[in-house]
Amino acid sequence: MKQLKPNSKYLLFGQALSFMGDYCVLPALLILSTYYHDYWVTSGVIAVRSIPMVFQPFLGVLVDRLDRVKIMLWTDVIRGVIFLGLTFLPKGEYPLLFLALLFVSYGSGVFFNPARLAVMSSLEADIKNINTLFAKATTISIIVGAAAGGLFLLGGSVELAVAFNGVTYLVSAFFISRIKLQYVPIQSENVREAFQSFKEGLKEIKTNAFVLNAMFTMITMALLWGVVYSYFPIVSRFLGDGEIGNFILTFCIGFGGFIGAALVSKWGFNNNKGLMYFTVLSIVSLALFLFTPIFAVSVIAAILFFIAMEYGEVLAKVKVQENAANQIQGRIFSVAEASIGLCIAVGSMLINIVDAAVIMAFIVLLVSGLFLHTKLVNKSFSERNNESEQIHL
């Protein structure tokens, strides 16, 4: 940390606080949505949070033409003001206004990540350090944010958690305003070329079995994430009034992810052992989460689920990085980002359409299909490695 330059420190501090607020407010928003007594509003919270991701791949065109630091600054200011404004909205009233404000906030937020990545690329020697520190800060921020939200709820009201998120955005904006980088506009590709890049990413996914499997993994996990998020308020009811349960379950995201990241090297890549762990954990943890009436069991199930999801996420990214040309990887991940946002939204809507048994049956079929496809791809990977070794001999 001491070796980081001032610009890197400001970016890291701002993002750590902002991420902490994000996971403090997520359960708070799910709690507020239950006051509308309509699960479509709960699903709507998840949908407006994820749908803007669909447009993120095409925003690089604008980001390259504007001052990236100012984009980050004003994005955080807008988000901070909106979340502070949400605290004045009466509970259970004006559902469309509630969702519209969230959509504007998360919609503006999709400009932030491309700008942040572009700023990080300007940090020169600090790039590796800040990426490593940011990865570590992510899981810690989730845990601290969820814990802070729980304390706010116990100490006063759920609105405090929402206000806390607004404050973290404004503090993040303060740190970002101190970043001193010379603005150099870049004449990047136009919108038509951006769509062409997107199509090239789709083509690579269709023709490369390894990349297709990575994509299959990512959209499957996104659907599962949407389902789990939508059930947070229901599962939380098994713990007293249920409100604090949302924060405990959000804590599980960070805790499970932390364990999952640590297990990646032990479970391995492109082997059937890791695949079996991922498949069994995904199905068993979701079954427990959806059907058990015991909150303690739900917490254990949530931790196991997020362990599996962290492992799957790392596996999918590495599969793309190892099996696709470097110049095409950005386009593949652009398609992935758009698909993930859409699939999280779809997964969150299932609770309003079919019951838990049908959702579980669908998940079993989907994960089983992923298991079979991955096993075939792993076999191809093993055969390819054996052929490569024989050539070198």
Curated annotation (Swiss-Prot):
One of its GO terms (cellular component) is plasma membrane. Keywords: Cell membrane, Membrane, Transmembrane, Transmembrane helix, Transport. It holds the Pfam family MFS_1. It is found in: Cell membrane. It is a multi-pass membrane protein. InterPro entries: Bacilysin_exporter_BacE_put, MFS, MFS_trans_sf. One of its GO terms (molecular function) is transmembrane transporter activity. The chain crosses the membrane at residues 11-31, 43-63, 69-89, 92-112, 133-155, 160-177, 215-235, 244-264, 287-307, 353-373. Part of the bacilysin biosynthesis operon. May be involved in self-resistance to bacilysin by permitting efflux of this antibiotic. Belongs to the major facilitator superfamily. This is Putative bacilysin exporter BacE. It comes from Bacillus subtilis.
